[in-house]
């Protein structure tokens, strides 16, 4: 009467088949009886998107999210429980009894829900090929809820932003708090109810960036969206019902996305089959920041960007403008006459006129007027004494400004025409002024030419070659090289303020000795701590490097870059004031036998990732391409949470447009970190920084200095030792032995970092990865290229040194080495 094994197999086979299909293919839908649990995923029918649990940066926090299924590294496009992560080992995403989608922890507590109950629980949740998670009624197949109506930081094709003034409903994008924290951050992207509408990025309650009004096919504040641009977006407004909808359409077969980053950048990406290509980024320069030049100020997108007053206006507070603070803007030089109801044909003396400004982004605070043509628009503004400007824009019609003109940008190409109201005397005197200025200029030129000729004749008679001398009667005149528009938002400190803060540069306040001078801790009167870099006269950092550091850092904003608060100039004294970082520099911990134990492998890996993100910002994501040229362990500062910040930009260089490399007659940097092509030919590029990053990476892993490491009888350098470790054990043995036993690191992670470091220090620049590839290598599990044996530098003395080489075109003529 027993059951044969064959019969058992026949009975159980369908169940095993169902189970294997379930585990391999993922859920088709989520129902009351089939919840989604940790470790399981729900895929879209075409396999484009996937829903499941994920943990940012391998933390203990678990989130339910949607990501691109077949793309590595993972790109999360939506998070359900972004404000409340799961911290228990068990969790379920299921349909509740009232038809809501709910997330339960191990105690059956509701962590997150859709908060929109349906009529019944006869429904299911599924993921569409658009990336939209939907709840569908089993009977009517109507959509009861969808994730596209509750966006996070990302827009996908077929999603939208909206507002409804009657109900108060709005659909916005909100940034993550950080790269590893999906909770709502500082930035929100929303559609405004203005007519016509525009897209604004808010930082808290303040406008951070705006697109300009929508003109049928694009935004007037985005020059890229010209007449030839095929827009993937559409915008519709129903003014009567108080609604607006901004939709993202699918224009190609490529995967695309729009994201607001935790740093406030709005970016558009497309996937080309091998990686994500950045198509658009804003803000791209200082002019993109809202109201950078204040009311009636004009931000000019030249190189570099700069502020100026509109025609007929002057700085409101001249001293503030000289100090680089333009946010107060400009005021009229001549008050308006404002004689209303006069036609342009009968204008006489004293009647207001309009000055036409081309290639501009229309200012904010505009009002739509239903005039049928440009002439009516002109007359409508002229007849209204409070109207300060007008514009008649194709695709919009007439816009009027009855307030201050704020956030106006002038482009080199593109943009609109803006007519500004001025007193008639502002234009009447312009022709007369040109004649006077031209006459004076011609007279001065003739006088100088005659004087130069007489001087040349005199020197010829004396048989002495011409000598040019430039005299400077002001000890601070070099400061004029700092154009105010280049250092907007920077504070100029008085010397007595800094002396008081640092206790007159007391030795007890000294934090350390940098390459260009000592660094002191200071405390301002408001109890704010600062770090003061005091440049010594013999430091080697002259006026050029000092001005370079001020101009450069003031334009860069990233969580992994040190923040410049201001500077102080007093005679020959030059000081830079930075944010104070309590843990000083990385070398303080890394090379100290006791302190190094505080930075175990997880902390070191976090530091490596932070530095790579900072370098990615410099090379790719900032408003300019920046080559640091002196990346090293002592230039990595640590905050109170051991997050790294790249510092010391005195030697950095900026690239514009498509420029990828440059050379210099003066090779500057630190021995051991300089790439071969830079050290011997002066040629530098992004790959020069990559080489230095590779050395830095190996130092962080090993806990050894590049300048003092010596191994074996052959005296191998750190690079040579790293190469041998990689050949023998995959690089695991390179890890600092003082932490290798205590922190039980993931060997695969260490080995991967060693291999990345070796790829970065390849002899030929073309063999090194770029920083975007480095970041991808660190965050993915794909196979890495095999590195070639690097060129190992000769062992150098136990002292970190900065080298400055002045070279001719074909050979090195002089080398000077300074202690760093």
From Swiss-Prot:
InterPro entries: Bulb-type_lectin_dom (IPR001480), Bulb-type_lectin_dom_sf (IPR036426), Kinase-like_dom_sf (IPR011009), Pan_app (IPR003609), Prot_kinase_dom (IPR000719), S-locus_recpt_kinase_C (IPR021820), S_locus_glycoprot_dom (IPR000858), Ser-Thr/Tyr_kinase_cat_dom (IPR001245). The lineage of its organism: Eukaryota, Viridiplantae, Streptophyta, Embryophyta, Tracheophyta. This is G-type lectin S-receptor-like serine/threonine-protein kinase At1g11280. It is a single-pass type I membrane protein. Residues 338-422 form the PAN domain. Residues 1-28 form the signal peptide. Residues 456-820 are cytoplasmic. It comes from Arabidopsis thaliana. ATP binds at residues 511-519, 533. It comes from the Eukaryota.
């Amino acid at each position: 009467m027993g059951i044969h094994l064959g019969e058992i197999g026949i009975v159980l086979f369908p169940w095993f088949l169902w189970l294997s299909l379930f585990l391999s293919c993922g859920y088709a839908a989520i129902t009351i009886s089939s919840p989604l649990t940790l470790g399981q995923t729900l895929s879209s029918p075409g396999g484009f998107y996937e829903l499941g649990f994920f943990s940012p940066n391998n933390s203990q926090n678990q989130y339910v999210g949607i990501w691109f299924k077949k793309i590595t590294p993972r790109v999360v496009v939506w998070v359900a429980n972004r404000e409340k992560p799961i911290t228990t080992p068990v969790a379920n995403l299921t349909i509740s009894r009232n038809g809501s989608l709910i997330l339960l922890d191990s105690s059956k507590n509701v962590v997150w829900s859709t908060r929109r109950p349906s009529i019944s629980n006869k429904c299911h949740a599924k993921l569409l090929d658009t990336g939209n998670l939907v709840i569908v009624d089993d009977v009517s197949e109507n959509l009861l809820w969808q994730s596209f109506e509750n966006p996070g930081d990302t827009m996908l094709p077929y999603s939208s932003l909206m507002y409804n003034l009657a109900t108060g409903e709005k659909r916005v994008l909100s940034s993550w708090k950080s790269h590893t924290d999906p909770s709502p951050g500082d930035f929100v992207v929303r559609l405004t109810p203005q007519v016509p509408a525009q897209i604004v990025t808010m930082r808290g309650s303040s406008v951070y960036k705006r697109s300009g009004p929508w003109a049928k096919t694009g935004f007037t504040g985005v020059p890229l969206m010209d007449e030839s641009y095929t827009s993937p977006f559409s915008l519709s407004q129903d003014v009567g019902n108080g609604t607006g909808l901004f939709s993202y359409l699918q224009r190609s077969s490529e995967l695309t996305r729009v994201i607001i980053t935790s740093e406030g950048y709005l970016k558009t990406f497309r996937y080309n089959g091998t990686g994500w290509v950045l198509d658009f980024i804003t803000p791209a320069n200082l002019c993109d920041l809202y109201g950078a030049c204040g009311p009636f100020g004009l931000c000019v997108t030249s190189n570099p960007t700069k502020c100026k007053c509109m025609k007929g206006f002057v700085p409101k507070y001249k001293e503030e403008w000289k100090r680089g603070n333009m946010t107060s803007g400009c005021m009229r030089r001549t008050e308006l006459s404002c004689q209303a109801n006069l036609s342009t044909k009968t204008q006489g003396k004293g009647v207001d006129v309009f000055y036409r400004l081309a290639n501009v982004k229309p200012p904010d605070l505009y009002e739509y007027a239903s005039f049928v043509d440009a002439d009516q628009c002109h007359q409508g503004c002229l007849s209204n004494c409070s109207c300060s400007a007008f514009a008649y824009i194709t695709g919009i019609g007439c816009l009027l400004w009855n307030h201050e003109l704020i956030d106006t940008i002038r482009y080199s190409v593109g943009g609109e025409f803006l007519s500004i109201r001025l007193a008639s005397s502002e234009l009447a005197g312009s022709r007369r002024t040109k004649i006077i200025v031209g006459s004076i200029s011609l007279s001065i030129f003739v006088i100088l030419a005659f004087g130069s000729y007489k001087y040349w004749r005199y020197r010829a008679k004396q048989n002495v070659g011409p000598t040019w001398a430039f005299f400077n009667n002001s000890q601070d005149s070099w400061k004029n090289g700092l154009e105010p528009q280049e250092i907007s938002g920077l504070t100029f400190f008085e010397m007595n303020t800094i002396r008081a803060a640092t206790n007159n540069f007391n030795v007890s306040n000294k934090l350390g000795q940098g390459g260009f001078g000592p660094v002191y801790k200071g405390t301002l009167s408001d109890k704010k701590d600062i770090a003061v870099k005091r440049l010594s006269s013999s430091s080697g950092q002259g006026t050029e490097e000092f001005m370079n550091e001020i101009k450069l850092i003031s334009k860069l904003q990233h969580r992994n870059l040190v923040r410049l608060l201001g500077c102080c100039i007093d005679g020959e004294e030059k000081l830079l004031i930075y944010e104070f970082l309590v843990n000083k520099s990385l070398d303080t911990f890394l090379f100290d036998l006791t302190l190094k134990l505080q930075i175990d492998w997880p902390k070191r890996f976090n530091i490596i990732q932070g530095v790579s993100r900072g370098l990615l910002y410099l090379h790719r994501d900032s408003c300019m391409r920046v080559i640091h040229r002196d990346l090293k362990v002592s230039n990595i500062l640590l905050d109170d949470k051991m997050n790294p910040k790249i510092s010391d930009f005195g030697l950095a260089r900026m690239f514009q447009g498509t420029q990828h490399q440059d050379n210099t007659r003066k090779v500057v940097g630190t021995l051991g970190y300089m790439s071969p092509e830079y050290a011997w030919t002066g040629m530098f590029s992004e790959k020069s920084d990559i080489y230095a990053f590779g050395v830095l990476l190996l130092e962080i892993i090993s806990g050894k200095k590049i300048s003092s490491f010596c191994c074996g009888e052959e005296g191998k350098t750190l690079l040579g030792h790293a190469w041998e470790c990689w050949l023998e054990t995959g690089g695991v043995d390179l890890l600092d032995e003082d932490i290798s036993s205590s922190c039980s690191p993931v060997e695969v992670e260490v080995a991967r970092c060693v291999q990345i470091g070796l790829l970065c220090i390849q002899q030929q620049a073309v063999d090194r990865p770029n920083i975007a590839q480095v970041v991808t290598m660190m965050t993915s599990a794909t196979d890495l290229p095999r590195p070639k044996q690097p060129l190992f530098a000769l062992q150098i003395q136990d002292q970190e040194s900065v080298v400055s080489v002045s070279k001719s075109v074909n050979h090195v003529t002089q080398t000077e080495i300074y202690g760093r």
